Amino acid sequence: MFMLLVFGALLPEVPLSGQDKAPPQADGISATPLFNYASLRLPEEHIPFFLHNNRHIATVCRKDSHCPYKKYLENLKYCWGYEKSCRPEFRFGYPVCTYVDMGWTDTLESAQEIFWKQADFGYAAERLEELHVLCQPKEKNDSSLVCSRYLQYCRATNIYLDLRNIKRNHDRFKEDFVQSGEIGGYCKLDIRSLMSQGQRKSPLQSWFAELQSYTELNFRPVEDAQCDIVIEKPTYFMKLDAGVNMYHHFCDFINLYITQHVNNSFSTDVYVVMWDTSSYGYGDLFSDTWKAFTDYDVIHLKTYDAKRVCFKEAIFSLLPRMRYGLFYNTPLISGCQNTGLFRAFSQHVLHRLNITQEGPKGGKIRVTILARSTEYRKILNQNELVNALKTVSTFEVQIVDYKYKELGFLDQLRITHNTDIFIGMHGAGLTHLLFLPDWAAVFELYNCGDERCYLDLARLRGVHYITWRRQNKVFPQDKGHHPTLGEHPKFTNYSFDVEEFMYLVLQAADYVLQHPKWPFKKKHDEL
């Protein structure tokens, strides 16, 4: 019974706010909607999948003349893929594999399944399957703790956190920050199971260091008035990677999005608490992205120092550098691409940040070159390459430098999402490929010997990837000057053969024009 009690809370229902407040009209039809459908803030394509997992809202919609989603009610079979009842043909998407990586498997079908579990909604399915109760409520509404393997994701109710005696220093992820009795709940703790989950104890891979001190308390924190502050809203705890690097920081955001799926809740009426044991602030160049996940400013843990804080509902988010996690530490099977998970993430963020597709206009292929104002990896003959591109009448060419002080992140996203061919040197700025339209191509002009990084990210997102092929057609300024390693290809600048460059860009353009989602069907004879 207690197991059912705990797991029943894992997939919370979206509250039917206003359901009892709508006054009926004389003809029996409610004058106002029975549910605030606008509060879902989901892309239209995601609505049937949301209704599949929230049948109570589907039921209300069926009864509500104001519901805008009635067209989806006749078929609620569409599912993300991690639901136990989900049939493969109704999944949000399924990877495409073009060849078999014999180091992993021997058939295309099994390759698809491997890739789906590695990097698609199958990854969320595996986290859901791992969930087990570590602290069982003694009675209804008592505390609980449920976690996936290695404590990579946890969900707690009525959790107590005592920060009256903590000591902060320069360490952002101090492992002994909280002691026994300073974190816990009123529930029956399976201490043996808890302590067996420490194999991947590491700051950005697990919550084990933070939760190994979880204590079975002899008091009910909230009911017994043991809290200086009670947080009523659901709260996501996160340990964040580098906020000044888009590649690393978006590992935070994609894992928060996966966590929302595991939690079956996409509400923005939640708090995000940055678990940071230092006294430092956090530099975040991409802070606008939080608007896709929360209505409030991110809270630093130190905000609660010297207090006993109780959280009615706490979620410990999946982390950015987990072993076999997404997407920093992911060994991927070759030959496969296009995950529904990363496409859904892109759609979700763009929708909530109000980034729209404005073209292409007049059949032009929009080519964006990402320039660098940093010391290294500059394109030395950039003007020559741009002039060559401008000789193609169907190209609309622009050069951008995504310097945060001059161009805000939302403006950067608008440019990226309205680009058909995105060109740039190896670097974190290429993470923008996550927000290209589905038909787009990304051209990593030179990967500087790091062959997998953005190739794999493009495969995850499902956009076409090309990079420089012929070493005798690229000309480094020198051998590179790494501050400690000496010669290094990432620490110099490059010139490129114009003819080879145009050959590769025209290949990318051909891909864009032939993509089934390319919205402009006119023949581009100039190409």
Swiss-Prot record:
It catalyses: L-seryl-[protein] + UDP-N-acetyl-alpha-D-glucosamine = 3-O-(N-acetyl-beta-D-glucosaminyl)-L-seryl-[protein] + UDP + H(+); L-threonyl-[protein] + UDP-N-acetyl-alpha-D-glucosamine = 3-O-(N-acetyl-beta-D-glucosaminyl)-L-threonyl-[protein] + UDP + H(+). Glycans are attached at N354. GO terms for biological process: protein O-GlcNAcylation via threonine; protein O-linked glycosylation. InterPro entries: Glyco_transf_61_cat, Glycosyltransferase_61. Its main location: endoplasmic reticulum. GO terms for molecular function: protein O-acetylglucosaminyltransferase activity. A motif (Prevents secretion from ER) lies at residues 524-527. Its EC number is 2.4.1.255. It is found in: Endoplasmic reticulum lumen. Residues 1-17 form the signal peptide. Keywords: Endoplasmic reticulum, Glycoprotein, Glycosyltransferase, Signal, Transferase. One of its GO terms (cellular component) is endoplasmic reticulum lumen. The keyword Zinc does not apply. Transmembrane segments: none annotated. The keyword Signal applies. It comes from the Eukaryota. It is an enzyme of class 2 (transferase). Catalyzes the transfer of a single N-acetylglucosamine from UDP-GlcNAc to a serine or threonine residue in extracellular proteins resulting in their modification with a beta-linked N-acetylglucosamine (O-GlcNAc). Specifically glycosylates the Thr residue located between the fifth and sixth conserved cysteines of folded EGF-like domains. Belongs to the glycosyltransferase 61 family. This is EGF domain-specific O-linked N-acetylglucosamine transferase.
